[in-house]
């Protein structure tokens, strides 16, 4: 199944994800808990999507790892995001990602895999076009770029370069 993982709060736009899923035949698991959980459960029921969308809450780390290992894709529908960490975890597991153009998502994901944040029509168009293609998306190159640009060694090297630049400027 395809997963969406995160705290169930307004900023994640899980309601738009659910509304955008109406034409999809795939199974979606929204993994997380939070203040929007009951509202989202009601929305799934009201849209007659209970056979395709499930909310799974209160999973421990090993259970979430298991979800990554069996997922065919990850969707990040947030309208505001710092990272998100789930993006890095999915790429590390070589899971194709579809997401909003927020945080570092556009830096790591091809533009054809992006929707406009907070725009339900954009998200629905993305899902209808790209969900059937998820098995064909190759994440190896993205994982290599991630390891090159976001590894601990890379971060240490960049930090060292910043310090060296600052030291040169002060001397």
Short names for language-model regions:
Residues 79:
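Aromatic "clamp/platform" in nucleotide-sugar-dependent glycosyltransferases that forms part
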Residues 96-99:
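Short hydrophobic beta-strand element within catalytic cores of glycosyltransferases
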Residues 74-75:
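A short hydrophobic beta-strand element within the catalytic core of glycosyltransferases
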Residues 58-59, 66-71:
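Short alpha-helical donor nucleotide-sugar binding micro-motif in glycosyltransferases
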Residues 112-121, 128-135:
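Conserved acidic donor-binding segment of nucleotide-sugar-dependent glycosyltransferases
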């Amino acid at each position: 199944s395809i997963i969406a993982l995160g705290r169930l709060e307004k900023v994640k736009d899980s309601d738009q994800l659910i509304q955008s899923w109406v034409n999809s035949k795939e199974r979606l698991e929204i993994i997380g808990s939070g203040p929007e959980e009951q509202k989202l459960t009601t929305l799934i029921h009201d849209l007659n999507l209970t056979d395709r969308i499930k909310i799974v809450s209160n999973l421990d780390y090993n259970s979430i790892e298991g979800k990554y290992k069996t997922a065919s894709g990850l969707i990040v529908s947030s309208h505001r995001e710092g990272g998100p960490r789930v993006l890095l975890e999915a790429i590390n597991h070589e899971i194709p990602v579809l997401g909003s153009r927020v945080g570092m998502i556009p830096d790591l994901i091809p533009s054809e895999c992006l929707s406009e944040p907070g725009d339900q029509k954009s998200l629905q168009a993305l899902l209808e076009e790209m969900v059937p293609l998820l098995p064909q998306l190759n994440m190896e190159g993205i994982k290599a770029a991630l390891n090159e640009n976001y590894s601990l060694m890379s971060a240490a090297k960049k930090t060292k370069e910043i310090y060296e630049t600052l030291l040169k400027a002060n001397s």
